[in-house]
Swiss-Prot record:
It catalyses: L-threonylcarbamoyladenylate + adenosine(37) in tRNA = N(6)-L-threonylcarbamoyladenosine(37) in tRNA + AMP + H(+). Keywords: Acyltransferase, Cytoplasm, Iron, Metal-binding, Transferase, tRNA processing. Fe cation binds at H116, H120, D310. Its EC number is 2.3.1.234. Belongs to the KAE1 / TsaD family. The keyword Metal-binding applies. Required for the formation of a threonylcarbamoyl group on adenosine at position 37 (t(6)A37) in tRNAs that read codons beginning with adenine. Is involved in the transfer of the threonylcarbamoyl moiety of threonylcarbamoyl-AMP (TC-AMP) to the N6 group of A37, together with TsaE and TsaB. TsaD likely plays a direct catalytic role in this reaction. This is tRNA N6-adenosine threonylcarbamoyltransferase. One of its GO terms (molecular function) is iron ion binding. Its cofactor is Fe(2+). It comes from Ehrlichia ruminantium (strain Gardel). It is an enzyme of class 2 (transferase).
Amino acid sequence: MVSNLLKVVLAIETSCDETAVAVVRSDKQVLSHKVLSQKEHVVYGGVVPEIASRAHINYLYDLTSQSIEESGCDLADIDAIAVTSGPGLIGGLIIGVMMAKAISSVTNKPIIEVNHLEAHTLLIRMFHDIDFPFLVLIISGGHCQFLIVHDVGCYQRLGSSLDDSLGEVFDKVARMLNLGYPGGPIIEKKSIMGDSKSFFLPRALINRFGCDFSFSGIKTAVRNIVVNQKYIDNDFICNISASFQDCIGDILVNRITNAIHMSQAINCKINKLVVTGGVAANHLLRNRISICVKDNNFEVLYPPTELCTDNGIMVGWAGIENLSKGYVSNLDFVPKARWPLESIKRSS
């Protein structure tokens, strides 16, 4: 085990379209955090992998230098380097991992390969005193899944999306309505002014046992409505946005209820649900989820809204959690576009 002295971790996140670097300390202090959200993708209505990779190349070195300088540390003060190694866009992952390995090699500091989903999952422990085990729902642009978190590096999947991720569906619906990218915040804003009962959308799998998701049918239903709509004005956009959000809320409530029952059947000590990932920043969905969880005698916890999307702080904290267990990596690890959270294997 690593000693109980304060540890300082330099963290690098390049798994998608955010280039982020942070310096985080084991007493939960953020010494610096630099994040650059790439605006280049807006015109395309989604992330273009090649553009994302080139942007990481252009920004990562300067962001790393700025983050170290802002932290008041130098490389000698860093105890370890944590880097997102997957899942994600392979081009961006390679760039982040190469930078982290270079720093580790030059400084002879340990390196920790971090699973992006583990970083989202463990971040809650930086802000709340939550013990293992607990239930987590990850809802983001690339993932939608329930897992039991037994410990750092020990996860059990209960259910996941059978097709699209939830964040992906928000982006695609926003694109159908010419609302721009990212779609989630825009649809949430429009839905506030709309009538959620204007259009009926299918609630896939809602009457089935389990906690898997399917969102492709909702996406198709919205497309059919948009194609057949003669006039697409602001009222229509607000109403379809509200109907879409209401549909997603119904599905989440149903799936969360099932996941709670499944998790307690596995371990009756589980009484907390963590909701994380970019879609967890949606306050209308948070309200629906919070009511559902309370009705099921559970407690729900969310990371700070600004840290629901990808960031360096979560990678740094995951690095600290792994370092506290003595989990470090060899320099020969490779980035992985796919890396299921339940498949993590740790060695100290």
